[in-house]
């Protein structure tokens, strides 16, 4: 919905219906360049999927605002300690397990806006209370993210 382009990148509004079960995915090769910025969100949502999610050929994530692969996986382990994670130089596997813990989680962002936004969205699915160590980092790319998230989720 509302498709457009900015800086040669496609943009659109996405509406998510959480009534259906998420399924694990494999993403690699020529699909990665077009999804590189979305991989942190795909990784966090993989915690709620049925089956394994595999991301490969995404080595460039090691050289963004943070080492996004390592930071994403360490925060996933905090969010759900039961999740099985395999970390590779160019990606990861996430094999989710049921998480019955409702304990609050502090998410370390290292100033990375995509990590902060991804875990805020994941917290809506799990209804887990999370603390983002640096919410202001989101202003880099999406200054009204928290305002819109609150509005959309009501």
Locate predicted features.
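Short, structured segments at the rim of ligand-binding sites
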Residues: 1-154
């Amino acid at each position: 919905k509302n498709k457009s382009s900015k800086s040669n990148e496609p943009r659109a509004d996405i509406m998510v219906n959480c009534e259906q079960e998420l399924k694990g995915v494999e993403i690699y090769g020529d699909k990665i360049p077009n999804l590189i910025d979305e991989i942190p969100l795909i990784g966090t949502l993989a915690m709620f999927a049925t089956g394994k999610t595999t991301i490969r050929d995404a080595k460039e994530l090691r050289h963004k605002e943070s080492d996004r692969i390592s930071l994403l996986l360490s925060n996933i382990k905090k969010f759900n300690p039961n999740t099985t994670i395999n970390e590779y130089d160019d990606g990861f596997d996430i094999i989710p397990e049921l998480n019955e813990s409702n304990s609050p989680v502090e998410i370390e962002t290292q100033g990375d806006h995509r990590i902060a936004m991804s875990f805020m969205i994941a917290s809506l699915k799990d209804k887990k209370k999370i603390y983002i160590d640096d919410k202001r980092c989101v202003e880099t790319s999406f200054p009204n993210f928290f305002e819109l998230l609150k509005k959309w989720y009501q």
